[in-house]
Amino acid sequence: METDEMNYEILKNATKSLKEHGKFIFTTLNGLFPLYHSVEEFHDAGSVEGNATCRSNTFDLMTFRDYNITEVEDDDGNKKELKCNERYYVPSEISWLLKTLGYIKIEIFGAKLGAYSRNDKLTSEDFEMLVVAEK
C-alpha cells in the first residue's frame, strides 16, 4: 500500500481473522535485497516480451520504498501505465510488527518463486521473504 500505516492495518485485519494459534503465512519484499543489488537491474533482467515492464525505478533508502512506472498490455492490446510504490521490509521490522500484533512464533525464510520452503535461509540474494507467524 501507499503508507506503512495502511500496511499495518492490513496485517492487523488479517490477524483479527485468525483463530487462536492460527498461522499467518505471507511473502513480502526483502529489504536486504536492495542493499546489495539494483532493483532496476533486477526488473530489467526479468523482463520478457509480453510481460509487464518497469521503468523509472528509484529506491528510497530512508523509507525502503521503490517507486517505478509499470507498463502492462492486456489481452485486447490495451496498454496501461501504473505508478507503483512498493515497500521492502527487513526481517527485524516484520518481526516487530508481528510481535506488536501478538504473534508468539515468527519464522522468516528465503522465498523462491513457486518453491517455498522452510529449508531456505533468508539472504540478501532473495528478492522476497516468506513469513510464517503463529498467534
Predicted regions and their residues:
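A short glycine-rich, Lys/Arg-flanked "PGG" loop and its adjoining helix->strand segment in the class I
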Residues: 6-23
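SAM-dependent methyltransferase
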Residues: 25-96
